[in-house]
Design a protein with these regions (language model features):
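Conserved P-loop NTPase nucleotide-binding/switch module
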Residues: 102-123
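A general structural motif
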Residues: 7-10, 85-93, 112-113
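The conserved Walker
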Residues: 31
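Hydrophobic anchor at the beta1->P-loop junction of P-loop NTPases
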Residues: 27
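P-loop NTP-binding catalytic core
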Residues: 1-24
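P-loop NTPase switch/communication element
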Residues: 47-98
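Conserved lysine of the Walker
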Residues: 35
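Hydrophobic positions on the alpha1 helix immediately C-terminal to the Walker A/P-loop
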Residues: 38, 42
């Protein structure tokens, strides 16, 4: 079961930022190693900002409610003050909807799978 560990991304942020700007980042590891937990904390820190990065607007497509853990439309995990969540939305559709209508500075998704997801990333 996934859970929140605030601060678990502290050591990663210096490696994915430069002059308070964010590099494009892909987290890769075997199942069960904590990618989603790490992603959740990265989203929170990117949204709120800190000494490594300015606060940015983040759009999350949470197809299976694993990142935000939404219940009745309310995120149960803390994803930051500048984060919008599309819960239960297919990733490919959600990424395109975010780009077209919400214009986030960062888009975060968990588990890129099929060619539709890749096409949406290229969009």
């Amino acid at each position: 079961m996934s859970h929140e560990i605030l601060g678990c991304a502290d050591g990663l942020l210096p490696y994915i930022t430069f002059h308070r700007r964010l590099y494009h980042t892909l987290l890769v590891s075997p199942p069960g190693c904590g990618k989603t937990t790490l992603l959740r904390d990265l989203i929170r820190q990117i949204s709120e900002g800190n000494e490594f990065i300015k606060g940015m607007s983040v759009g999350v497509v949470d197809e299976r409610s694993e990142i935000a853990g939404c219940y009745r439309g309310v995120a149960q995990n803390h994803l930051g003050i500048r984060t919008d969540v599309l819960d239960g939305c297919p990733k490919a559709e959600g990424m395109i909807m975010l780009i077209r209508s919400m214009r986030p500075e960062v888009i975060a998704v968990d588990e890129i799978g099929g060619s539709e997801d890749v096409h949406a990333i290229e969009y």
